[in-house]
UniProtKB/Swiss-Prot annotation:
It is found in: Cytoplasm. Its EC number is 5.4.99.62. Substrate binds at D28, H97, Y119, A120, N121. The gene is rbsD. It comes from Bacillus pumilus (strain SAFR-032). Gene3D superfamilies: RbsD-like domain (3.40.1650.10). Catalyzes the interconversion of beta-pyran and beta-furan forms of D-ribose. The active site is at H20 (proton donor). It catalyses: beta-D-ribopyranose = beta-D-ribofuranose. This is D-ribose pyranase. Belongs to the RbsD / FucU family. RbsD subfamily. GO terms for biological process: D-ribose catabolic process. GO terms for cellular component: cytosol. Homodecamer.
């Protein structure tokens, strides 16, 4: 049995299989999930698990080169926008929400949280550890 880190076997496999520039989406419970990416649904109830909980864990486990968000998060969800800016030392890349949704089609996986606040979504772009 795995002793630490992310125990979810689906997430652990996706992380182990990532290559440089591959992407993972962390989604609120309302984001449409396209056909193609692996769907990992963690939602239990509204708000559980939260966007911030899941994102924090993934940032600990994954080499992240940059993060993309919908530009609308800046005004519609200041709390999660500030969280991302503090949790990630580099500037966030922002695109309009329709472009963001289109980008999810190329992701290796979409992790659905129980988060129910506007634009609580991000795309993590894999970096390298060397």
């Amino acid at each position: 049995m795995k002793k630490n880190g992310i125990l979810n076997s689906h997430i652990a496999k996706v992380l182990a299989d990532l290559g440089h520039t591959d992407t993972i989406v962390i989604a609120d419970c309302g984001l449409p999930i396209p056909e193609g990416p692996v769907k990992i649904d963690l939602s239990l109830t509204i708000g559980t698990p939260s966007f911030q909980e899941v994102t924090s864990l993934l940032l600990q486990e994954m080499a992240v080169e940059h993060i993309t968000v919908a530009s609308e998060i800046q005004e519609a969800n200041e709390r999660d926008h500030l969280f991302l800016k503090k949790a990630f030392s580099k500037p966030l890349h922002d695109v309009d929400h329709e472009t963001f949704k289109d980008m999810t089609k190329q992701a290796k996986a979409v992790i659905r949280t129980g988060e129910a606040t506007p634009y609580a979504n991000c795309i993590l772009h894999a970096g390298v550890i060397f």
